[in-house]
Amino acid sequence: MKEVDVVGAGLAGAEAAWQLAKRGIKVRLFEMRPKKFTPAHQTPLFAELVCSNSLGGINLDNAAGLLKEELRFLDSLVIKVADRNRIPAGNALAVDRNLFAEEVTLRLSHHPLIEVIREEVVDINPERVTVIASGPLTSKALAENLKKYLESDYLYFFDAVAPIVAGESLDMEKLFFAGRYQQDKDYLNAPMNEEEYLRFYEALITAERHPLKPFEKDIYYEGCLPIEVIASRGKDTLRFGPLKPKGIIDPRTGKEPYAVVQLRRENLAGDYYNLVGFQTNLTWKEQNRVFRLIPGLENAEFIRFGVMHKNTFINSPALLTPYLNLKKYPRLFFAGQITGGEGYVAAIATGAWAGIAASGMFGKMPEPLPETTMLGGLIRYLNTAPVENFQPMGVNFGLVKPLDRKIKNKKERYKLLAERSLKDLKRWLAVNG
């Protein structure tokens, strides 16, 4: 019987299940929530976005934008649902996280070839075709069981989540809507003068943090650093990072502020706002104190405080084939952030590829993806990165095979890389679709 187990119904597992089912393969989709939650999840919904509600850029000269377009070519359910539940966020694809997760859950739960099993998986059968998409917060029992197939210890880094505040608790007299360089006015901005910035900075770097366990090193993913860690690198680091004012004009002064905090809508109604770039490991008491120093947030009601959690991933270059299955146990596939592909869209993409590849176990395996595509480049990285110091990687144009000729203008170069990628993916689909 053509049947595959998918462990975990996050972004990667949801997409893998969809890709398998659309190819006529029965899926048993395991999800331990709501019986057991991870430190970051809050709902039993599939594809819950535990960090930001943004899936990154939409333009094709943006790496995440190109990868999303490739996924549309692959008929990605998760991207299709994201497009349908989009909320204004300038050049980014941000979604109403609840409507998004609810629709993914509904679509998969009602698919005739997908059986949803709400149980924690603690034991893997290497004889069954299985996609392991248990995420960077894989349960302790499953992680221990997987060790016998991985023959190595897990790697890890710390990831952090930004707080969310209630829109009605904000002082809109001190805030304004604007985008950078007078683009779409989709972000709410809290401008700071120098005095306000320095007061906030001093409070931030001296605030109490949740302690790490004695045996844990403070290894962070550079793409999602806690804001207090960024601040500790220098007084002006924030002003060139998440609080940079470049391109934002305060309508009350007609000038760029000294620094600016941006807030992004969490839903279409604007009931909730995410503090952009404010991933944090501060204690909740300190978040209340420090973040209320931001102009307009003096009486902010925190719907969710920022938290930090340990993310686990495997040494993919040592363990996986280009199809994301184990070299020694070829029926076991891996997908999502546990592979070391960092970020939402990389998780969806590796889920899509693992699902497509796993379907090949019942017939003919697909040809490897072209390395000229963003997805093909990401898979190549997961296969060929240095084994000794393997680190998670977010999508970027450095993953894609270079053009035959040099193009100095970066925007033009990325545009040509994107055009080539989609053309080559169309050719691949004509043979492997």
Curated annotation (Swiss-Prot):
MF terms (GO), sorted A to Z: flavin adenine dinucleotide binding; tRNA (uracil(54)-C5)-methyltransferase activity, 5,10-methylenetetrahydrofolate-dependent
InterPro entries membership: FAD/NAD-bd_sf (IPR036188), MnmG-rel (IPR002218), MnmG_N (IPR040131), TrmFO (IPR004417)
Residues the record lists as binding FAD: 8-13
Highest taxon in the source lineage: Bacteria
Cofactors required: FAD
Record's protein name: Methylenetetrahydrofolate--tRNA-(uracil-5-)-methyltransferase TrmFO
Catalytic activity: uridine(54) in tRNA + (6R)-5,10-methylene-5,6,7,8-tetrahydrofolate + NADH + H(+) = 5-methyluridine(54) in tRNA + (6S)-5,6,7,8-tetrahydrofolate + NAD(+); uridine(54) in tRNA + (6R)-5,10-methylene-5,6,7,8-tetrahydrofolate + NADPH + H(+) = 5-methyluridine(54) in tRNA + (6S)-5,6,7,8-tetrahydrofolate + NADP(+)
PANTHER family in UniProt: GLUCOSE INHIBITED DIVISION PROTEIN A, METHYLENETETRAHYDROFOLATE--TRNA-(URACIL-5-)-METHYLTRANSFERASE TRMFO
One Pfam short name: GIDA
Top enzyme class: transferase
Family classification: Belongs to the MnmG family. TrmFO subfamily.
Record's keyword annotation contains Glycoprotein: no
Any one GO BP annotation for this protein: tRNA wobble uridine modification
Subcellular location: Cytoplasm
E.C. no: 2.1.1.74
Chief location category: cytoplasm
Keywords attached to this entry: Cytoplasm, FAD, Flavoprotein, Methyltransferase, NAD, NADP, Transferase, tRNA processing
Role, per record: Catalyzes the folate-dependent formation of 5-methyl-uridine at position 54 (M-5-U54) in all tRNAs.
HAMAP family the UniProt entry points to: TrmFO (MF_01037)
SUPFAM superfamilies: FAD/NAD(P)-binding domain (SSF51905)
